[in-house]
Amino acid sequence: MNSIHIHTYPRIHFSLIGMSNEGYRINGGAGCSISAPLLDCHFVLSNSLQIIDQREYPMSAKELNKLTQTIESCIKKYELQNIYKCVINSDTLFPHTGFGSNTMIYLSCIEALFILNGLEYTQDDIVINSTRGGTSGVGIHTYFNGGVSIDLGVDNIKEELRPSSLGARSNYPLQLCGFQAPQWTIGIMIPIHVPSITEQQEIDFFRQNTPI
């Protein structure tokens, strides 16, 4: 196998649940996956690791570097021989617009490593090595199973409340339930001319507004 496509679908996140830092658990969330817009990651075996984001509004250089470091850590951990060039495409699914595209990309990149190297793996292997899922489990659970996901967040060990872009915690969100959503027609309006926030703005928002 020399190349693979991994198609992933966005999630709508209804809410984070526990943001007070006073209970036994923090974060937690509810949301569901939707069938469009599609994100396509095309992986082709290569002599060097390359990540090419061809979307109209791509990841920043800092974000691409962070993704590359995550992939390289996984390569080193498992002593993998097959590396790839990854080309990311989507017509309307851009970073930091509320659909979990970065989580989708990270999970896809780790899963592609396992597939192209012929490794047996579990969902936990993908999540742990992706460093995602540190805030809500909606993105990681819907990546694998679609549908609706409700999770209870993580144990409160008095860590900083933060977005998943700051890396995974020592454990990741416990799913309370997951089930297939009704086949509702959902309309989404994406204002093209309104710039999305940056990763740093997202981090700053959490620091300025939590705990609640």
Feature names for model-found ranges:
Residues 2-7, 15-17, 21-29, 122-212:
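ATP-dependent small-molecule kinase catalytic core of the GHMP/sugar-kinase superfamily
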Residues 1-97, 101, 111-123, 134, ...:
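ATP-binding N-lobe of GHMP and related small-molecule kinases
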